[in-house]
């Protein structure tokens, strides 16, 4: 009986440890889920896309889009010119350090400034390791959906 209890206790402890050691959220997976649930289509640009396929990108290309030579987070996913929302754009950066997070926030703020021309048609959400920006038309829906996506991936 003691052996059974010990085995059950060890299994329970193992499950608890594994659950607490989850990996960081993946930008590509989060953006894919967001696009699907929001109903937008377009190419997701990410370093997770194999070279030669639609969506393959490099830090050099991202630095040109976001007009930065600063630190660029290594995990990101961006949809440019969403087909279902009048050419809107959205992106997520998953940051491993405060320097990456600060750079991602600055990059997104500058991108939103350029895209929206200060007309209030933009959304920037900083949540833990993730920085998300959007120019999608329905800000409230995008924000609610993004928060659900973040919760399901962390």
Predicted regions span which residues?
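Sec-dependent bacterial lipoprotein signal peptides
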Residues: 1-19
């Amino acid at each position: 009986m003691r052996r059974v209890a010990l085995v059950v206790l060890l299994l329970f402890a193992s499950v608890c440890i594994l659950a607490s050691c989850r990996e960081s959220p993946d930008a590509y997976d989060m953006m894919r889920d967001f696009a699907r649930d929001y109903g937008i289509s377009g190419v997701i640009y990410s370093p997770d896309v194999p070279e030669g396929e639609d969506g393959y990108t490099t830090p050099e290309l991202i630095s040109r889009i976001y007009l930065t030579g600063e630190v660029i987070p290594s995990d990101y996913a961006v949809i440019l010119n969403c087909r279902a929302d009048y050419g809107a754009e959205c992106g997520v950066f998953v940051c491993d350090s405060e320097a990456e997070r600060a750079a991602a926030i600055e990059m997104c703020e500058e991108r939103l400034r350029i895209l929206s021309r200060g007309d209030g048609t933009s959304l920037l959400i900083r949540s833990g390791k993730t920085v998300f920006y959007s120019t999608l038309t329905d800000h409230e829906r995008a924000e609610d959906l993004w928060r659900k996506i973040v919760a399901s991936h962390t």
